[in-house]
Amino acid sequence: MKASKGRNVVVVGTQWGDEGKGKLVDWLTESAQGVVRFQGGHNAGHTLVINGVKTALHLIPSGIMRPGVKCYIGNGVVLSAGKLFEEIEGLEKAGVEVRSRLRVSEACPLILPFHAALDVAREAAREHGGAEKIGTTGRGIGPAYEDKIARRALRVQDLKYPERFAAKLRELLALHNHVLSTFLGSANFQFGDALKPYITGGQVQFEPVFEEAMRHAEMLKPMMADVSRELNEAHAAGANLLFEGAQGTLLDVDHGTYPYVTSSNCVAGNAAAGSGVGPGHLHYILGITKAYCTRVGGGPFPTELDWETPGTPGYHMSTVGAEKGVTTGRSRRCGWFDAALLKRSAQVNGLSGLCITKLDVLDGLRELSLCVGYELDGERIDLLPMGAEEIARCVPIYENIAGWTESTVGVTHYENLPSNARRYLERIEQVTGVPIAMISTSPDRDHTILMRHPYAAD
């Protein structure tokens, strides 16, 4: 194969998701010819603001907002065809051409209505039994990945063969309806309106699921592709590719705050497995991190603040940062920047550089705290532990840093930032050992400070 001059960049979240990856992916696609989603499902939410217009995406790569950029959904994504077409139709109404530019891997496992039903039932059963909820979005992501790992999933390619699809579907329904009946017996809850058309007497019915899947199949066929082959051919031809991670490192099923995690690998290494592009072709790993920390749902959060009481720094972050989930609308928990957490993320991702987002949210705070380590059971440590129970016992060790009252909104040159903002960023670099490549100073695409371009040659 001919040597390529193309450069491939992986973008990953370094915290618990919601770091602002969508904006940065959109910004970077000016230098890319293709953008790839490689894990997760429609539980992820990316918000883009372009010329003042806000667009929320859940499945389709953020590069779709750049005319001419090809977008790929890789084999590591679990796909709800219904949600995909909802998103396509919304973009088309806004004048965005999607279908000719989007390719979907035939190897993607499908999310079907019984996956969402299982997700909802399990969370209800946990709550009924007195256990803390995991905090899933209830969209069927986890159960769909379970079917994949158990080697029984229906995949996109199965949609091309109705008889094969029907036979596999009947087998899956027999299994999952049995499990559903067990959950229904242990918790009193109701399925939401979105699931009611598929369920009779607490059981997911074959006909509505099959008929809907066949309708989706006809619409999806023109976009089905061998995504691995297309990406490798594009790379060989010299194209720059961008791999767009969803969620964040601390939600990774292996490296996150287990069990309060998602069901996929969110780390940079999965960009290869989830797309079919070899790891030797991934040239730069950009870690996206907020200038503070947020988390949605349950699980330990060492630097969490009181974010509900007016007048507190946490409340400032929550309100000024508009910290509500794109997918669920749930309020995000807020806390100080955690450099010990970021050091863990830097290790497991092999970060080449950082992009600090939402720096402008800290405008007006006169004093900031930066977590540089923890005290755990009487011992000082400077790296986030692996276990959720240990993380929950961590007491943050803070450095206090002077804040700033000047506005950073819209600043596009580093030297124009307030001096205290520069000191804060430089201290983050020193403690984490990762150079800052980019800084975001508002949700707008153009409000970005570039220090080192990820697509520039080393």
UniProtKB/Swiss-Prot annotation:
Binds 1 Mg(2+) ion per subunit. It is found in: Cytoplasm. One of its GO terms (molecular function) is GTP binding. Pathway: Purine metabolism; AMP biosynthesis via de novo pathway; AMP from IMP: step 1/2. The active site is at 18 (proton acceptor), 46 (proton donor). Keywords: Cytoplasm, GTP-binding, Ligase, Magnesium, Metal-binding, Nucleotide-binding, Purine biosynthesis. GO terms for cellular component: cytoplasm. GTP binds at residues 17-23, 45-47, 332, 358-360, 440-442. GO terms for biological process: 'de novo' AMP biosynthetic process; IMP metabolic process. The keyword Thylakoid does not apply. The keyword Lipid metabolism does not apply. Plays an important role in the de novo pathway of purine nucleotide biosynthesis. Catalyzes the first committed step in the biosynthesis of AMP from IMP. Belongs to the adenylosuccinate synthetase family. This is Adenylosuccinate synthetase.
